[in-house]
Amino acid sequence: MAQQPTKGGSRSGRRPRLSLDDWTAAGLQLLVTEGRTAVKISRLCDELGVTKGSFYWHFTDIDDLMKAIATRYTSQDNDAARGLTSVEELPVRERLTRMGTMLVDDRAWEAEVAVREWARSDPKVAESVRALDQRIMTVVENAFLELGFDKDEARVRAGTLVYAGIGFVYGRDGLPSPTVEQIQALLTILVRK
């Protein structure tokens, strides 16, 4: 990720030169902390200490930025930050355990909640979220296939775990958060033949 410039420009008095990644990171951060309606060109320019010309160098309008934010968040490039790429290389039981324990990491869910909420009102973002969910489902389903479950059993077990994760995203403020031990207990049930 590109380094965030300081508010008001660089120490030399010259305005920082921002990349597309800088803009999408700043937009995503604002989306997470304040919601979709807070993401405005003037607000981001103030936050980043640059003029609107810098924004228009990368984007045609705010919708173009929002598309880039959605793409960044749900892309396979972000799978490393989400932990998907590293878990695929682990032994299968450890892979499931790692994915399960990701469910109790509050930091990961802030952006997830914001993007999923945004997807409810934007069909393009909803499509990106569906593609992300499908990638996650595939990783989990493949893990159950590796454990020797047939295709139907693997899909049902993977669905149980993936839907539990999505439910946690939406229920985490009103329901008790599962502990690592409870996640482990669920995984023990799911891997039992």
PLM features: residue spans?
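Short, basic, alpha-helical segments at the C-terminal edge of helix-turn-helix-like DNA-binding modules
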Residues: 41, 71-77
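Hydrophobic/aromatic-rich alpha-helical bundle segments in the mid-to-C-terminal region
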Residues: 126, 130, 145-193
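N-terminal intrinsically disordered/low-complexity leader segments
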Residues: 1-18, 149
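Helix-turn-helix
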Residues: 19-22, 26-68
